[in-house]
Structure formats: structure tokens, C-alpha cells
Amino acid sequence: MGGLEKKKYERGSATNYITRNKARKKLQLSLPDFRRLCILKGIYPHEPKHKKKVNKGSTAARTFYLIKDIKFLLHEPIVNKFREYKVFVRKLRKAYGKSEWNAVERLKDNKPCYKLDHIVKERYPTFIDALRDLDDALSMCFLFSTFPRTGKCHVQTIQLCRRLTVEFLHYVITARALRKVFLSIKGIYYQAEVLGQPIVWIAPYAFSHDHPTDVDYRVMATFTEFYTTLLGFVNFRLYQSLNLHYPPKLEGQAQAETKISEDTYALDSESSMEKLAALSASLARVVVPAIEEAEADEFPTDGEVTAQEEDRKKELEAQEKHKKLFEGLKFFLNREVPREALAFIIRSFGGDVSWDKSLCIGATYDVTDSCITHQIVDRPGQQTPIIGRYYVQPQWVFDCVNARLLLPVAEYFPGMQLPPHLSPFVSEKEGDYIPPEKLKLLALQRGEDPGHLEEEEEEDEDDDNEGDVAAENEEEDVEVESEEEEEEEVHLSALEQHRLEEKKPQVMAGTVKLEDKQRLAQEEESEAKRLAIMMMKKREKYLYQKIMFGKRRKIREANKLAEKRKAHDDAVRSEKKAKRTRPV
């Protein structure tokens, strides 16, 4: 009565997947082109739940794709472009072999090319979706922008990545969107808040590159090809939101100031890019009519809503204060410090920054300027100090941004041992170990005295105690004899008094026992908790025990870290003490 009986592996999960080779043959593409197409379209392999069924009983290692994804790729117009490019390469190779140079030039002029605009719109229907997926795009573009001009990747790709990243940095500076910075072994982590979306990316340090051989640069270049298109769309929309020219243009005043030294630093074709990359000048805005923002009406609300609004207002005020952290301060960067990272951070928080004119284009004032408040140095004793400015190490700038306030500069003077650089991306929960430096920072944020001089006071007390030991020993020898005599007299009198009191009948006064309400409440709560645990089901009790075991383990780990830190501090303190007492 039913339909035709289907054979094995022709229904169920076996029909939902297709192997990579079958998919490649269906699309009539080579393996590199198939990989490229999947990267551009965002199609990734899937691991079936029942791999043996999908693999028709075989256990061989194979890569599977969803068959609906492959059907989706069949209608992609880029597939035809890939085939046209294969024909173009074949014709070009034949023309080179026959030395037909006119045909070579004609073929190069008619080289097939394609655009990824429709793919970007397809993968990110809204602008917020694009912002949420911008982390990897920024990290990859910042990486490619630092590559040297070698045969590993095209020069045009490197230049495009450099231009797009500089444009994004200028947007962050203009919008004051930077929130957190962290120096790590891999590079510098940044976090910016763009239209309410947190975006985190990593920028590598400006070191010379030694390209590893175990990396597939073609795959990375394919990702970069898509990411550059995406970042171009995003930059255009972001510049529009701030009424900025796109492509970006410097303000007329900044262009006039740098026009004198234009021929010295770069060619006419590169000078504008060099000035933009300096990050020292502001961007020109599109003149638009000013629109007065309507103030929101305030209505009487409940107490809870009012408290939430007050907390929100305080948070916004703190955020606005954080955006103006370096406002009114003028910085000068020495040659040995990372110029681009510091210039980007300082300008993102309203500060003015400059450097030596021979170092890079875009310097706005000299080292002799009397208005300089902070000079960033990393080599102590290299310059003659100028009165009226602070000389600090670069870490001070990064720590101030993460602390949301201007930290004391005493610990960051040149030659000083720097405090630990705490990560702003770590948030301690209840029961976690909090290092003493984080506690001091929290105290500073609350406006309290963190007590930086506790260790020095303890060391001074130890020294004073050592000096007083000899004098106290002499006094103790004199007082020992008199104390022993007094103790014997007191002991004899106490025995006599006790013997007399035993002969007399005594009436002891009763004591009123006051109930400790807090202790009783705790006992009732613990008893109720014990009864609740007894009434739990077996599965619930097992889950509860796992939760409590995790909490106890976290407490043990926190205590272990605290003990290690205490042992380290004691060792450092004893080492300092030994150095101080050692004869010169």
C-alpha cells in the first residue's frame, strides 16, 4: 500500500550531507577555487551527528557540507567569473609561449574581475550585523597592513589594508569611541564602542616580519579580500554618521601646516596618505545645517525606575569624563616609543601629541614647547630634563585609559620598575582572587587612599625594632628580679584569700542570658537549608553538590594564589632588607 521501498542510506541524515569532492564536481571547480568560494560566501563544513550513516557505513575521514549550502552556491555569479579567469590564464599562458605581446596586452586589459558587494549585503542584512562581525576583519586588515612588500601577498592588498585601517582609526579618534587597551605578547588589544556595539581587535607590534612557512597565505588573502570590502562599507557608513568627508580629508589648517615639508617626506601621490597615517590632524567635516535636538519630557515615575535612571545618568557622566581623560594635556613622544599606538590612544581621549619632525610627518610642535605637560620616554638619562613637565614611561598612558583616571606618575618615572599591567578584559567575580594592585586601583577609583607606603612603613618599623632590641634587653635584665619577687607575693596572698573564702557560705548572683537574634536567625536559616537539601531529588542533589564543589574549588584556588602572592612579597621584602643591611 505504501510507496516504493527506499534503499539504505537514501533517507534521513544521509541525504542532508555531501562530501567535498562531490560538491566540487557538482560546481565544476578546482579545490582552491572551491575553498575560495566557500570562504567568500561563509559556507563551512559540518560534522554529522551520525558520521557512519552519512558516510554509507565507512569510517574514513571525509569533509562534509550541507547539501542545501551547495545548492545555494550553484546560483552564485562569481562561479562563472572563476571559470572565465581559468580561461583567461590559459589564453595568457599561450600568448606568452608564442611571444604575441599585443595579445598579452589585450588580454590583460580584458582581465575578468568581480565585486563582492552583493555578498556583503547578503551576509549582513543590517549595519549592526556587520559591526558585530567586524572583530576578525579588523584584526586581519591590521595584520596585512604591517606586512613587508614581498612575494607572499600583493602590494595592492597591503596598501588597501593600510588605508582602511587608518580610516577606521580616524573614526575612533573623532567619535572618542576607544574604551580599553591591553599590551600582550601577541600585540595590542583595543576595544572600541561603535554605535553601542563593543568591537575588539588586535594590532601587531611594528617589528620586522619573518614569514612562517607553515601558513597558507592564499587562504588568508581570500579572507582579507572579503574583509577589505566589508571594512570599506563600514567606514563609509561610519563617516556618514559623523558628517565626515569620505574618502577622508584633513582640515585646511592641518594641510597648510604640513605643506612646507611635503616634498621632504613623500611624493605627491603618497603625501596625503602619510599625513592621514600620522593621526595628528583632525578630519574635515561636511557642512550641514545644525538641528536642535528635542529634549525628552520627564514624567513622574516610580522609585525603582528613578533609581535606574540615576544610575544610568551616573554611568553616562563617567563615560563622558572618560572620553575627556587627556583633554588639556600636551604630549611629546620620544623616538624609542611606539608612535602610532600612543598617538592613537592620546588623541582618542582628547590630548594633543607630537614628535620629532625627523621621525615622521605630522609633527605639530617641537620638544622645546613650554606647554608640553608629559614627555613619553623609554630610555632613562638620554635627555636633559626640562622643568614643568612629567617624564613617564609609555605604560602610564595605557594604564590611565584602563583605570579611567590619571594615575600618579611617581611609579612610571624613567628607570623605575613598572607596576604590573593589569588586563581590563578580566572582571573578577565573588570569590575570585583579586591582586593587591587591582585593589589599589579600585580604591583610587573610589577616591580613597590606596596606601602605597604600607611596605615602606613596615620596613621602617623593622629597622626601628632592630635598633631598640639592645636597649630593651638591658632594661629587661634589671626588671626580671623585681618582677619575680612581686609574683611570689601575689601568689601567696591569692592562696590565703581562697582558703578563707572556702569556709564561708556563698550565694552566687544569677546571670541574665541575652538571646543573640542574629545567631538565632543564622541557625534557623542553616536548618532550613539543611532540610531543603534533604528534600531534594537525587538528580537535583547531585547538581547542587557539583555547584558547591565548584565554589569550594574556586575558593581553594583563590587562597592558593593569595598564599603565593604573600610568599612572593615576603621574599621581595627580605631581599630589599638584605640589600639595605649589606655593607657597601
From Swiss-Prot:
Gene3D superfamilies: BRCT domain
Region Sufficient for interaction with MAP1B, annotated ranges: 312-414
Pfam families: BRCT_2, Pescadillo_N
Span list, region Disordered: 449-510, 560-584
Keywords, in A-Z order: Acetylation, Chromosome, Isopeptide bond, Nucleus, Ribosome biogenesis, rRNA processing, Ubl conjugation
Region listing for Sufficient for nucleolar localization, in residue ranges: 1-257
Acidic residues: compositionally biased ranges: 454-489
Cell compartments where the protein resides: Nucleus, Nucleolus; Nucleus, Nucleoplasm; Chromosome
GO biological process, one term: regulation of cell cycle
Positions of the UniProt region annotated as Required for 28S ribosomal RNA processing: 1-54, 535-584
Start and end residues of each BRCT domain: 321-414
Domain of life, source organism: Eukaryota
Residues bearing PTM N6-acetyllysine: 98
Matching InterPro entries: BRCT_dom, BRCT_dom_sf, PES
Glycyl lysine isopeptide (Lys-Gly) (interchain with G-Cter in SUMO2) crosslink site(s): 513
SUPFAM superfamilies linked: BRCT domain
Role, per record: Component of the PeBoW complex, which is required for maturation of 28S and 5.8S ribosomal RNAs and formation of the 60S ribosome.
Family statement drawn from the similarity comment of this UniProt entry: Belongs to the pescadillo family.
Subunit structure: Component of the PeBoW complex, composed of BOP1, PES1 and WDR12. The complex is held together by BOP1, which interacts with PES1 via its N-terminal domain and with WDR12 via a high-affinity interaction between the seven-bladed beta-propeller domains of the 2 proteins. The PeBoW complex associates with the 66S pre-ribosome. The PeBoW complex also associates with DDX27, PES1 interacts directly with DDX27. Interacts with IRS1 and UBTF. May interact with MAP1B.
Designated name of the protein: Pescadillo homolog
Organism: Mus musculus (Mouse)
Lineage: Eukaryota, Metazoa, Chordata, Craniata, Vertebrata
Gene: Pes1
